[in-house]
Structures are given as C-alpha cells and as structure tokens.
C-alpha cells in the first residue's frame, strides 16, 4: 500500500472484528489517537501498529474483554448523566440552603416567552443563548425539550420533561427510570428529506426494491406512512414523509421520532430552499444526517459543488476534513445504495439506540385516516415497549382497544416491538398525525383520560359577522374583523397539521389566521353549523360537501372553498388579505348523477348507466368522480348518450349513459358531478 494512504475507523474495526465504538476507545486509551467518529481516518502506519498490537494480545483482548474494558465507559457516562440529573433534583440540604434552584416542568415543547418568564430572565438573554446554541427562535416560537434543557443548564436551572400531564397517576409508569439491564438494541428510524424533484421518492423506491414492485404489481400500495427493510440481517425503519416546503410541520414531527436523516441533494441541482429547511430541522432536533448526493448518473452531476454548498451551511463533508457523511448515489442505476444503507447502520451503531421491549408500549402516530369498511385506522411507530393486539390505548384525545394490527406489508400481526411500524384498528375516532400513544391498563381508563383531554383542549367559538375571502380585505380595513377562522377538511389526516401551520403562518398584525377545526372526510352539515357559529370559511382538500352541507351553506351564507393543491388555498388567502383577490373564473355546478350500473365494452372502456339526480349533465362540461365524499378523479366526458343516441344534455329525472375521458374504474354508487368554469368580471378588493 502507498505510504500516504489512510484507513477509516469503521473499515479497521471490521478487520479487527470489533465495533467502531470500542475501537475509538482503544485508540484513545492505548495509542492516544483522538478520532471524532467511525468515518474518521487513521494513518496506515498507525493502523498496522494497532493490528499488530491487537494480534499479539488477542487472547487477553478478545471482543468481549474489550467491551468489558472500554464499553463500560459509555454505560458509566450514561449512569453519571442520570445520576447528575437525579442529583440536580435532590441536592444536599446545605446546597439548597445556599441557593434555591429553579425547577421547570414542561411537556414536549415550550415557548421562548414562557421559558424566559420561568427562568426569570429577559427575552433578549434567552434568545441570545439560543442563537449561541444554533437555535433560531422568536419570543412566541416553541423550542423542544433538548434545547430547553441545555438552556436551563446555562442559567443554572433544572428543566424536567413531563410526558403526560393528564391523569398522571394513571400513566406515571411511563416516566419511571428505565432499567438499564432491560434495554436492548433497536432498529434506527430514518426519515428521507430533500427538495422536491431531487429524487427522494425514487431513492425510497430503490431502497425498497422488490417490496415496492410486489405491492404495486397487485395494484395495492400500503399507505402506512412507514416501512421496515432488512439489510445484512439488521432492520431499518423508514418514515415516508412528504418533501414539500408546505409540509414543514410533518417533517418537524418526523424529526421528533427520527434517529437519522438521509438528506437527498441532486448532484446537478445542489442545495435548494426545501433542502435548507430540512437541514435547519435536523440541526434544531440534533438529528444526525447522512447526505445522499443523488442523480450521479446525470451528465451535469457535480458532487464537489454540492459539498461546497453543504460546507457553507455548516456541514463539512468527511473527505473535506469534516464529520458529515456524504455518499454519491443514483436511484436510477442503484449505484451507492448499499453503501448509503451501510453508513446509516454505522451511524446507528454510534448512537447506541436502545429500548425496553418488555414494558407497556408508547410511541407516535405517523398517519391516520377514516376507512369506510374498517373505521378509524392509525399508523403508529412503537418507540418503546411492545404493542400487542388487544391492548387498551390512549392516542391524543381518542382511545380504544386494538382489534387488529397489520405490518407495513398489510400482513396481520399480533405484536410490534420498538421502532416497528404498525397499522391498528379499534380507535373511537381518527387521531391526529403526531399524537403520542400510550398503553393503559383497561379501556375504561383510556376513555376517562381521553375525555379529560378533550375538556382541556375544547375551544370556545365566538359568533361574529359572516366572512368570505372576497370581502375579507375590506372587513379588515374597516376593523370589523381581527381573526379569520378556517375549517379544514381533507382526505387524509396526515396532511391536516401541515395545512394548519401553513395557513396560520399567514397571520399578520391586523388579522390572525386560525384553523379552528380539521377533520377527515366529506364536508358535512356539522362543519357548516360550526362555521356559522364561528364565522369561519370552510376549505376542502380533495373532498366535496355532501348535499345537506350545500343546502345548509346556502341558507346560512357560509362560504365553502374546495382545492386540489394546498398552495392554491394559501395564495387565495394571501391575496384576500392584501386586497388582491381577483377571481377570473367561477365554478358552476351543473348537476349530479348517480352511477347505478356499469358496462365494460371491449376496445372502448367502461360505460356508466346513470340517473341524473339534480340539475343537468351537458356534453361539454367538466366532471369529477366522487366516491364516499372524496374526489377520486377529474376529467371530461368522452361520451353522453340517451338510449343509443348521442345527447347534448340530459336533465334531472332521466337516465343516461356516460363515459369519462381516461377513466374506466367507475363503480356503482359513485357520484358524477358536472361543472363548468364561467368567466366573471374581474374584481379588485
């Protein structure tokens, strides 16, 4: 080998047959060689010396003995930290007499303002310290427990996390100190983040390989929000979260349950706004990153440019002398995928991820939805303990007893251990994505806890004058409105919180945008009643109002806006607030028809035998297919017939045959809604 060549710590540990952690301790204690992590390099001369030393003393320095000798260092550090935390709470009486310590109890997050007040420090002092820690937060923004704890140490205060503050006597089992001997190694939970179109989904698909191919071949893809793969006999759990800037809250939520982030950056595009946003989330949550420089098969690929941009953001690549792992990959050719996963496992090894599978389970909701046949369905990640079928659980403000449990491939299972995703049935309502869940002793306890939580979180809605987006700006200027209330309905629960935060970010000094309710499914009369009582605008994403809701909204003068894309709603509200809403087209619903029978004609497609319930269906109208209150397809009519003759229009009370352009999956019971876009006079507010 070349005299100047170097070897990485993890490669050397493989040769010696010991873990990277133990080798780092060995280097420090026996050779006084300081290395940062498993990706650091040592000189070839030193590596040969270590091999020689290890070879000579192999009998007395077996892996077990080395672990006994050096592995205890980490355990001792953990014990010291835990002991120190206990000692902070239980100081000697003499010390307490000398100085009274501040003890602050908090939940998962706390605002900078509240923490400043409880620390008895000015906002400026606290914000300055946060900036020194690399956390950028304004007075009213929330910070997590880890940041608050570090801040407490700076100001000589003790910050204690209170996991569950409702019926604490029922859940105190969850905040007991973990038994050290009860913990075992668990799989890492990984989130893939990156800018839109940088190949995040392609990379996930390449990692899943045959699992994806097998599920898609049958026409069914499990939307569980997480899945587990096995590589070299070790499991890795991936969170499948959206990659757009609007889904900030989802990624922030993911960072709370994520152990490692794979940051995808296109080699030909470099760092973009969503990439920078993802980097900031990881830094704030102190989650280690492995950077996947994707699209290396492209002609314009420039990994050095990406590394330069990463360095500008404080992430210096390990081959540039830093400690950020970068792996060139191609989701298209599969190049570098195995190396990437190996780096993930090595990073996980350095983190020493452990949990106790023998306790009652707790974890987080990844996604949830309302299934017509199965009722409320929740996808969970178990973070500690083992979740069993038949367990009684509380999830946010809902509760239930697990009737059935499925893995990420849709197979029925009886239990799920730490870091394993599972889909469960048996909850009373659809929970929110990001809700924490806990197993309790029985369903009665879970119900009581859920009811108490509902009482605590129930908001009071004040009835004021009606509001619409078109006249919002004038009402703001006249001082008639200080708050814009919005009700959000969507087809999947996982997007509700992301939509909520995106809309609430639009708040200004003159008007506060507030999402007062979010739910899954069609817009109902109940939503209209709530909107009427609280002067709210109803916004639907990929869902439609039912007939009762339409009648009630017209009667009560409640505005219902429906969208397919979140950004359209944000832009409309933005324009309304600054007086620039200029609608050019207005959607006019022409009629609705119920599908009563379907006919498949070879080489032609599916014909729907329909009965027109209201209005009329015209040949040139746009149509949307609605199934169980959710829009599943939008297109145009390719054929409209009355008996065997072509028809220009069919009125209410008559039957007709309909074919929809590029859509053959029409089913009995579907509703076909016909509409036209009418040009209206431009209106400046």
UniProtKB/Swiss-Prot annotation:
Entry keyword annotation includes Nucleotide-binding: yes
* Annotated keywords: Cytoplasm, GTP-binding, Initiation factor, Nucleotide-binding, Protein biosynthesis
Database matches in PROSITE patterns: G_TR_2 (PS51722), IF2 (PS01176)
Return the NCBIfam families for the record. Answer: IF-2 (TIGR00487), small_GTP (TIGR00231)
Span list, region G5: 330-332
Against Pfam families, the record matches this protein to: EF-G_D2, GTP_EFTU, GTP_EFTU_D2, IF-2, IF2_N
Q: Where are the transmembrane segments?
A: none
Q: Where in the cell is it found?
A: Cytoplasm
What protein family does this chain belong to? Belongs to the TRAFAC class translation factor GTPase superfamily. Classic translation factor GTPase family. IF-2 subfamily.
Species of origin? Clostridium tetani (strain Massachusetts / E88)
Give me the ranges of the annotated region G2: 219-223
Q: Where is this region: G4?
A: 294-297
The residues listed in the UniProt record as binding GTP, with positions renumbered to this chain, are 194-201, 240-244, 294-297
Its recorded name reads Translation initiation factor IF-2
Q: Name one GO cellular component term.
A: cytosol
Please list the GO terms describing molecular function.
Answer: GTP binding; GTPase activity; translation initiation factor activity
Q: Which domain of life is it from?
A: Bacteria
């Amino acid at each position: 080998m070349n005299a100047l060549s170097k070897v990485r710590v993890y490669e050397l540990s493989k040769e010696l047959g010991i873990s990277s952690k133990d080798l780092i301790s060995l280097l420090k204690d026996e050779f006084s060689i300081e290395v940062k992590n498993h990706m650091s390099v040592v000189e070839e001369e030193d590596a040969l010396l270590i091999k020689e030393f290890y070879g000579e003393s192999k009998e007395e320095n077996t892996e077990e003995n080395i672990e006994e000798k050096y592995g205890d260092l980490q355990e001792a550090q953990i014990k010291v930290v835990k002991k120190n935390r206990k000692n902070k709470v239980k100081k000697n009486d003499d010390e307490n007499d000398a100085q009274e310590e501040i003890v602050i109890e908090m939940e998962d997050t706390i605002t900078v303002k509240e923490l400043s007040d409880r620390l008895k420090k000015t906002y400026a002092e606290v914000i300055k310290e946060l900036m020194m820690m690399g956390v950028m937060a304004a007075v009213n923004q929330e910070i997590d427990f880890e940041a608050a704890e570090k801040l407490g140490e700076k100001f000589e205060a003790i910050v204690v996390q209170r996991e569950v503050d409702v019926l604490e006597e029922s859940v105190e089992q969850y905040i007991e100190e973990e038994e050290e001997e009860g913990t075992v190694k668990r799989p890492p939970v990984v989130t893939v983040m990156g800018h839109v179109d940088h190949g995040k989904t392609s990379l996930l698909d390449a990692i899943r390989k045959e699992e994806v191919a097998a599920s898609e071949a049958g026409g069914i893809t499990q939307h569980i929000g997480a899945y587990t793969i096995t590589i070299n006999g070790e499991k890795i759990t991936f969170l499948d979260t959206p990659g757009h800037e609007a889904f900030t809250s989802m990624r922030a939520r993911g960072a709370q349950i994520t152990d490692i982030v794979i940051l995808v950056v296109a080699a030909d595009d470099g760092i973009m706004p969503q990439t920078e946003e993802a980097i900031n989330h990881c830094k704030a949550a102190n989650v280690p990153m492995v950077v996947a420089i994707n699209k290396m098969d492209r002609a314009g690929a420039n990994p050095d440019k990406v590394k330069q941009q990463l360095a500008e953001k404080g992430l210096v690549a390990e081959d540039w002398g830093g400690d950020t792992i970068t792996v060139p990959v191609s989701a298209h050719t599969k190049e570098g995928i195995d190396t990437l996963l190996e780096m993930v496992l090595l990073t996980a090894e350095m983190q020493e991820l452990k949990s106790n599978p023998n306790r009652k389970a707790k974890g987080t909701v990844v996604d949830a939805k309302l299934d017509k046949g199965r009722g409320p369905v929740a996808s969970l990640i178990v973070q500690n303990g083992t979740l069993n079928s038949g367990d009684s659980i509380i999830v946010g403000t809902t509760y239930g007893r697990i009737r059935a449990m499925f893995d990420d491939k849709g197979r029925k299972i009886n239990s799920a251990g730490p870091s394993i995703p599972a889909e469960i049935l048996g909850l009373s309502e659809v929970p929110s994505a990001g809700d924490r869940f806990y197993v309790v002793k029985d369903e009665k306890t879970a119900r009581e806890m859920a009811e108490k939580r509902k009482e605590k979180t129930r908001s009071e809605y004040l009835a004021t004058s009606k509001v619409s987006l078109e006249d919002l700006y004038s009402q703001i200027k006249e001082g008639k409105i200080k708050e814009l209330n919005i009700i959000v309905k969507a087809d999947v629960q996982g997007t509700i919180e992301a939509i909520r935060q995106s809309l609430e970010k639009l708040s200004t000094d003159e008007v506060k945008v507030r999402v007062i309710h979010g739910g899954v499914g069609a817009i109902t009369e109940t939503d209209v009643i709530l909107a009427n009582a609280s002067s709210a605008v109803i916004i639907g994403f990929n869902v439609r109002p039912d007939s009762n809701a339409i009648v009630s909204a017209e009667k009560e003068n409640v505005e219902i806006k429906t969208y397919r894309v979140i950004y359209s709603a944000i832009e409309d509200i933005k324009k309304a607030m600054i007086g620039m809403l200029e609608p050019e087209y207005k959607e006019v619903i022409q009629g609705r028809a119920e599908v009563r029978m379907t006919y498949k004609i070879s080489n032609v497609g599916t014909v729907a035998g329909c009965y027109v319930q209201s209005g009329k269906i015209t040949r040139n109208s746009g149509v949307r297919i609605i199934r169980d209150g959710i829009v599943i397809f939008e297109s145009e009519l390719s054929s409209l017939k009355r008996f065997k003759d072509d028809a220009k229009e069919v009125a209410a009370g008559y039957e007709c045959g309909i074919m929809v352009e590029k859509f053959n999956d029409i089913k009995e019971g579907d509703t076909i809604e016909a509409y036209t876009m009418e040009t209206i006079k431009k209106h400046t507010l």
